[in-house]
Amino acid sequence: MIKKQKALIVGGSNGIGLALAMRLVKEKSVLIVDKVEPDYSQVPSDIKHLVSFRKFDLLFDDYSLFDEFNDIDTLIITAGFGKLSLFEDMQEDTIVDMISVNTTSVLRIIKHFYGSIHSRKPFYTAVMVSIAGFMSSPFFSVYGASKAALKIFIESVNVELKKSGTDNRILNV
């Protein structure tokens, strides 16, 4: 019996994450981890049983939830947020939360799945970075910085993966 593949989408309750879930569910079961439940009215009834949900806020300290998902072969991280604001007007707690959700949480999740990413067995990983991580953007200084950090992180880890001999890479979307 061939085991059905499974995708984990962090931030898959709406937007691009949910659209990816609806596309992937044609090929494999999908687990969505997000702080809000998906809008199930967007999920066709004939495939609803292939989509499951676990509530999790990326601002939590304990990421052990991700240790439960050792049966996935695809990891997609789309979670993140931005705030249109001049840096001088941004509250410090917003800065901390944005860096935590957009950058630190991604590194922590990648770390939880690094054994699978680093293995010789195919493991598909994609992170929604943003064009803001590639260029300066007034009113998006903190968001851009959080995404630029991801860009450099992914490039660096991909070099490490290549040098280790695995064909797996992290796709910067």
Predicted regions and their residues:
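N-terminal Rossmann NAD(P)H-binding glycine-rich loop of SDR-like oxidoreductase domains
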Residues: S13, A21
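Conserved glycine-rich Rossmann-like NAD(P)H-binding loop of the short-chain dehydrogenase/reductase
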Residues: E27-S41
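Conserved NAD(P)H cofactor-binding loop of Rossmann-fold oxidoreductase domains
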Residues: T78-K83
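Substrate-binding pocket helix/loop in short-chain dehydrogenase/reductase
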Residues: L86-F87, T94-D97
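Active-site helix of classical SDR
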Residues: I110, S146
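Residue(s) in the substrate-gating loop at a strand-loop-helix junction
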Residues: S130
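Active-site loop-to-helix junction immediately N-terminal to the catalytic Tyr of the SDR YXXXK motif
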Residues: S136-G144, S156
